[in-house]
Swiss-Prot record:
Metabolic or biological pathway: Purine metabolism; IMP biosynthesis via de novo pathway; 5-amino-1-(5-phospho-D-ribosyl)imidazole-4-carboxamide from 5-amino-1-(5-phospho-D-ribosyl)imidazole-4-carboxylate: step 1/2
A molecular function (GO) term: phosphoribosylaminoimidazolesuccinocarboxamide synthase activity
Domain of life: Bacteria
Entry protein name: Phosphoribosylaminoimidazole-succinocarboxamide synthase
Homology family: Belongs to the SAICAR synthetase family.
Keywords from the named record: ATP-binding, Ligase, Nucleotide-binding, Purine biosynthesis
Length: 241
């Protein structure tokens, strides 16, 4: 696909988004920046952008092959990809299969507790408010999404959880929890967006429960790039990804 990168449209914590000569296509460059606690902790980690781009590209391609519509078009280089332009729904959708992180602190349930069924949580995307946990009633109040869009998002999220658990199970990795974002394309269709990587997923080794995700950075537990490289290598060994 011959697309020309134009001016910078938006720079976030982990990615730069550029306009292109096609109004419906955007150019994404993954950065080596690492942040945690709503930007309170920051670092530059060489190789992180490459690994997140490669892992996210692999996963989005797999999900597309399974019939799950998403914004990914193609990988351009180790750190770059093309995506469909969408209007982001201001919600972070978190799926929890095992208790960890903020859920453990909030509810007083020990980290590592298996959930009988996945729990879906919604967070309002607003840095100034600290991305608060909200209910579906709050979503209507904030006009963040319509009831129909929320039902579509929940349905897609459930399917994505099943697919991701299958992918990571084949890699001998436990999918503890993960964050999804969604957008609306030019026709108003809900599409899976943003990224799916160890930045947005909690991933533990199935045998040892070793953390292979951004908690290594959050909690100063070890090398982020070594863990991300391990996830990338395990995914690369799966024939269906």
């Amino acid at each position: 696909m011959n697309i020309v990168k134009n001016e910078l449209l938006y720079e976030g914590k982990a990615k730069k988004i550029y306009k292109t000569d096609d109004e419906n296509t955007l150019y994404v460059v993954y950065k080596d920046s690492a942040t945690a606690f709503n930007g309170e902790k920051k670092a530059e980690i060489s190789g992180k952008g490459r690994l997140n781009n490669e892992i996210s590209s692999l996963i989005f391609k797999h999900l597309h092959a399974k019939g799950i519509n998403n914004h990914f078009i193609e990988r351009i280089s180790e750190t770059e990809q093309l995506i469909k332009k969408v209007t982001i729904v201001p919600l972070e959708v978190v799926v929890r299969n095992v208790v960890a992180g903020s859920m453990s602190k909030r509810l007083g349930i020990p980290e590592g507790t298996e959930l009988e069924q996945p729990i879906i949580e919604f967070y309002y995307k607003d840095d100034a408010l600290g991305d608060p946990l909200i209910t579906e009633d709050h979503i209507w109040l904030l006009k963040a999404a319509t009831p129909e869009q929320v039902e579509t998002i929940k349905s897609i999220t459930t399917i994505v959880n099943e697919e991701l658990q299958s992918i990571f199970d084949d890699c001998h990795v436990r999918l503890i929890d993960f964050k999804l974002e969604f957008g609306l394309d030019a026709e108003g269709q809900v599409l899976l967006a943003d990224e799916i990587s160890p930045d947005t997923c909690r991933l533990w080794d199935k045998e040892t429960n070793e953390k292979l995700d951004k908690d290594l950075f959050r909690r100063n537990l070890g090398s982020l790039t070594d863990a991300y490289e391990e996830i990338f290598n395990r995914l690369g060994g799966i024939h269906h990804v």
